[in-house]
């Protein structure tokens, strides 16, 4: 079961631009192969212009001129280096295109710590997770749109949105490059 606070975040508006089929899913079309490549390229910092254009178009369509009062903030990647490669130029470009306030510099990944996760077979598994530091004063009282590259169940997005709201922000919803799918229709 999903925590009530996380569900509250998942109930907010979400947009995603393509389907992502994990590499182990083989019988996918050329379109899905191209989408998978776009996801990988974006994660490696290469396809940010195309994704920034789509993201900006979605924000402008949904929020119009009020984009100038919205903070754009991505769910941080697993390390500070990956976060910079994936999001620094991307966030700057989305904010140039929309007039939104760039939240990139107000969140940082400062290291890793161990956590225990229960997996599908109910076995306990120890994983490293990133420690995220926030510029609390910056987010207090702000409307925020959260971005993440891929949404599967939405727990990373919902957890991050909750963290922002605990600082006094109002998360409006999430935008995602892709949504994970496992069955090819």
Where do the language-model regions lie?
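Active-site-facing substrate-recognition patch
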Residues: 1-71, 108-140, 179-182
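Glycine-rich phosphate-binding loops at beta-strand->alpha-helix junctions
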Residues: 76-86
């Amino acid at each position: 079961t999903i925590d009530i606070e996380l569900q509250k975040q998942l109930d907010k508006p979400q947009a995603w631009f393509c389907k992502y089929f994990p590499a182990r899913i083989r019988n996918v079309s050329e379109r899905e192969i191209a989408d998978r490549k776009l996801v990988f390229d974006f994660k490696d910092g290469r396809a940010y212009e195309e994704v920034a254009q789509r993201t900006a178009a979605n924000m402008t369509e949904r929020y119009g001129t009020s984009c100038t009062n919205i903070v754009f903030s991505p769910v941080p990647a697993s390390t500070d280096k990956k976060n910079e490669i994936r999001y620094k130029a991307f966030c700057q470009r989305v904010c140039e295109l929309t007039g939104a306030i760039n939240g990139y510099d107000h969140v940082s990944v400062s290291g890793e710590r161990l956590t225990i996760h229960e997996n599908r077979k109910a076995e306990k598994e120890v994983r490293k997770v990133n420690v995220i530091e926030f510029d609390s004063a910056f987010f207090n009282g702000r409307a925020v749109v959260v971005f993440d590259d891929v949404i599967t169940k939405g727990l990373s997005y919902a957890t991050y949105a909750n963290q922002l709201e605990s600082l006094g922000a109002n998360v409006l919803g999430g935008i995602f490059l892709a949504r994970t799918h496992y069955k090819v229709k």
